[in-house]
Amino acid sequence: MSELVADPTGRAVLRAVAPGTELRDGLERILRGRTGALIVLGYDEVVEEMCSGGFVLDVAFSATRLRELAKMDGAIVLDRGATRVLRAAVQLLPDAAIETGESGTRHRTAERAAKQTGFPVISVSQSMRIVAIYSDGRRWVLEDSDAILSRANQALATLERYKSRLDEVSGTLSALEIEDLVTVRDVASVVQRLEMVRRISVEIAGYVDELGTDGRLLSLQLDELIGNVGPERELVVSDYVDARRAAALDDVLAGLARLDSTDLIDLVKIAQVRGLGGPGGDALDSAVGPRGHRMLSKIPRLPSPVIGAMVDHFGTLQKMLSASVEDLQLVDGVGALRARSVREGLSRLAESSLLERFV
């Protein structure tokens, strides 16, 4: 179900049926009992008009109740949060004109009902013993936790390799920024790795949602690996984006997210999205300079408004590096104590970045 993970609605559906939830327990009971079921996750006027027969319950949801109600013919209607059983043994009559790619009666009804109501609809196949979820015009099949964990562990190993390479190119960029030797290629390489890490981490986050209580360890490993990758991505873009365009940061981040896998390995394409390297983005060896957001963010206890004020005042990282304590105090919000802290912080960062590169 990895295609769900970038979609907030899909993520919510995954969490609703993840292991450890009452709904998942009920679905597994239905499978073990070798019966089928049709379950609507939501209720409004559209669903009410679609329902025929059955009876109104409006009782608290439980896995055992779901299992017993599934023994009867007809669909079960739950509230959106799957906390109450609203109706049972109803016949769903969705619009027959709605297209469906399914062949079985239960699955055809589920797909049409999901499209017509906008609510997720779950179909449990009695013969094939599978659970299918229909939502937003798509279909997903629930899998066993072991199969999901196997894919998740492979993705986690890939993330570890990506993160290791990201740390390397990020450290190199820091040293080059200190020496004022940054090229478009260096920036594009870091952005490329940041986007690759972001994408694989989003996929793993989807597995965490899908695994529910079985994904706790995976979630801890993911949090430890990605750390501050999200803020780092925005800081790198901010350092090399056109400061005169208010929407430039969001435009670049959105453009990077739209790149397909083939374009993402092409540094020229990445440079084009960032507006670097000339009109065609192919001048990868042309020199560029950072504004200083990323380097200043590494100084402890330096608030974001002060970082923004310093970047606006000096314009480039090189001017900050050459600024004295007195020069730093000219920035709004920077007193003598903070100026000395920034001056010492920049000096330590410059020294450590160069040491990491050459040692």
Swiss-Prot record:
It catalyses: 2 ATP = 3',3'-c-di-AMP + 2 diphosphate. Its EC number is 2.7.7.85. Participates in a DNA-damage check-point. DisA forms globular foci that rapidly scan along the chromosomes searching for lesions. InterPro entries: DisA (IPR050338), DisA_sf (IPR038331), DNA_integrity_DisA_N_sf (IPR036888), DNA_integrity_scan_DisA_link (IPR018906), DNA_integrity_scan_DisA_N (IPR003390), DNA_integrity_scanning_protein (IPR023763), RuvA_2-like (IPR010994). Residues 7-145 form the DAC domain. GO terms for biological process: DNA repair. This is DNA integrity scanning protein DisA. It comes from the Bacteria. It is an enzyme of class 2 (transferase). Its cofactor is Mg(2+). ATP binds at residues 74, 92, 105-109. Keywords: ATP-binding, DNA damage, DNA repair, DNA-binding, Magnesium, Nucleotide-binding, Nucleotidyltransferase, Transferase. Belongs to the DisA family. GO terms for molecular function: adenylate cyclase activity; ATP binding; diadenylate cyclase activity; DNA binding. It comes from Beutenbergia cavernae (strain ATCC BAA-8 / DSM 12333 / CCUG 43141 / JCM 11478 / NBRC 16432 / NCIMB 13614 / HKI 0122). Gene3D superfamilies: 5' to 3' exonuclease, C-terminal subdomain, DNA integrity scanning linker region, DNA integrity scanning protein, DisA, N-terminal domain. Homooctamer.
